[in-house]
Amino acid sequence: MKQLTRLLALVLRLALSLAVVPTALVAQQPKPAATATDYASALAAIEKSLEEKRKELGIPGMSLVIVKDDKVIYLKGLGVKDFERKIPVTPDTRFAIGSSTKAFTAMLAVMSADEGKLSLDDSPKKFLPYFTLRDEEAAAKITMRDLLSHRSGLNRTDLAMVTGMLNREELIRVAGMAKPTAKLGEKFQYQNIMYAAAGEAVAKAQNSTWDALIAKRIFKPLGMNNSDTRIEDMQKSRDYSFGYDYNATTKVTRRLPQRAIPAAAPAGAINSSARDMAQWVRLMLNNGVINGKRLVSEKGIDELTRKQINIAGPLDYGLGWFLRQWNGHKVVEHGGNIDGFNAQVAFMPDQKLGFVLLTNVTASSIGATAMSTIWKELVGVPPTTATAPASDPKKEVGKYLMPAGVGFDVSLKDEKLVLTVPGQPPYPLENLGGRRYRLGDPAPGGFFATFRPVKDKESETELFLEQPQGNVVLKKVSGDGAKPTVDAGATADNSLISVDELLAKMIAAYGGEENLRKHKSSVMMVDVDFENQGVQAKGSVSARAPNLAAMDMTFTALGKKIGTIVSFFDGAAGGEVMSFAPEETYSGKRLEDIKAGSDFYDVLNWKANYKTLTVKRMGKVGGEDVYILEKRSEKGTPVLDYISTKSFLVLRRDSVVVSETAGFELPQTQSFSDYRNVDGVMVPFKTVANSLVQGDVVTRITDVKWDIDIPDNAFKKPATDKHR
């Protein structure tokens, strides 16, 4: 079971680095708007704030442009574009802008609609006869508008994309085979491949290519002569940045290879400079006009920047743009994240104000800081009053626990509440009245926290967290209003089974200590179905006593090999080698989780591998009663196991997958079933892992062999380039 857990965690770790979320727009303390004569001091404050944040987040370099009233009022490079040689960033340094590309693709669509070449309510099949979806009703009704507003019903299907082995038509076909996670138009689900389909449909409608249309219809008329859609062109320029990631645990900056995504180019392939991107912002702020020439109709701009679907709370999505309010002002924005680069484009139409921030590090939160700082300094923050009196913040202080066992801390700092999430920066909580708060800078947009009494238990408190990917309830476990708890290692309820008794029954259920210890190694052959991705995998998962583990997987789509992954852990150190992503070395919490989870004798050694074991409460999994056991290691992340009261086998596991470089912790749930006795040991032949990023991943064991002679080098980094 532990080997399957590592397989699923590995793929989720990759997904973390590709996750794109809207950026926060944050309220600030009252501050008057800057006047034209005050720009110098306001711009100096902006630069100071962002330089401090850049250094804090380990960002080698960035370039910022600010546009106000159709004029560039700030344009500067900060830091370095080449970390190794310390070459400075300039205003003309090219960076990858990632998903900020989507607004350009949407612009091409509305331009084409202006010309009558297509309608936003056309079916993509009109231009792409091969386009289809697994849901036949959705396939019959889906429109270009649905593709451009992330409401196709599909979860992210990025796995096939990142391998780089499929062309655009193949990627679209793979997405069409993926199992949907919602009905058409039911909810917002970020979808890169649907944007690739939209861009390809526009190209077919115009009898051209997406790259040519971007150059002809947008770059050329805007004078964006320092922009491109291909890495090869970027690298031929005289001034471009390398891309990097930064490990917050080891403080190491690493150069990354640039990711070419020609097949999904309409979703994120543009490279540009701050100077060029100023022209793009001017076009949007001038309602489709640049230097007196109209490039797109006012109706087209309205389509781009009006609500097409709600994401969560006040956060909406247009066509290629996130939409919301900031102190009564409409804000239109979109971030971008791709290997080694992160971007933020944002503008405030009624203030004729916008900016572009380009950085050379993966998955940075600095865009949120830029937005809040620039709005505060140049627009000003009027005094505001909450819709209802704020409750006493002191009573909200304490620890809150996610279903996956991750603890969130709420504390007071300068008489204001702060939410701290493991592995992330602290988020100030801004009161919206009563016990409702907005998560401040640098939280992603659309995150809100409401403290409330537990239903039918008014004396206890819970935290209701609203987020774009789905809401979650966290139970308060310490502080006023917390459910009473006991010392670690005991039961949370005296009527529950003790930890020692539970472990004894589990050991017996899995085959007994003698049977478990008689084996010294195992090799499992597995088939994996990424149901919501349209991708499959086959491979082996190997383990050897006392705590060595390895995995070798081959991924396929449309019957074609698209990639490989090897993971390895020798008992002390390890990592991952992939054909489609940079090599990863385990560190920080990720390494600690691997250490705790790789013990060959698993449940026999839980007491040694985890600092605390606590039977928290009773629960149900699929109608079956379970004990919920929390496992906490010294430095890793907590795990919740749901153990059948009948069979004493683990039916479900809640945990988190950590990426030290992407700076995320992604909750996942795994369900274990089809237990079979293999040479005296119970093995779950089916595992279903679920996360917001990957959807359902179904793993089936096809063969188990015990006590195979596995050489030491199987648990070391591969010596060849087989997996590159």
Predicted features along the sequence, with ranges:
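Catalytic loop of the DD-peptidase/beta-lactamase superfamily, centered on the K-T-G motif
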Residues: Q28-L75, L159-V162, A203-K216, R238, ...
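Active-site helix/loop module of the DD-peptidase/beta-lactamase fold
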Residues: G61, P91, A96-S100, S112-N155, ...
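Gly/Pro-enriched, hydrophobic low-complexity segments
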Residues: D441, L558, G622-P718
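N-terminal mature ectodomain segment of secretory-pathway/periplasmic proteins
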Residues: N207, E501-A504, A508-P582, A608-R617
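Short, charged, amphipathic alpha-helices and their helix-cap/turn boundaries
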Residues: A42, I46, M161-K183, S208-N225, ...
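A short, polar/charged loop-to-alpha-helix boundary motif
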Residues: K81-T90, S365-T373, E660-T669
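Flexible, processing/modification-adjacent segments and terminal tails
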Residues: T385-S391, A490-L502, I507-A508, F568-T637, ...
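N-terminal leader/targeting segments and the immediately adjacent pre-domain N-terminus
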Residues: K2-L10, L14-V89, F95, M111-S119, ...
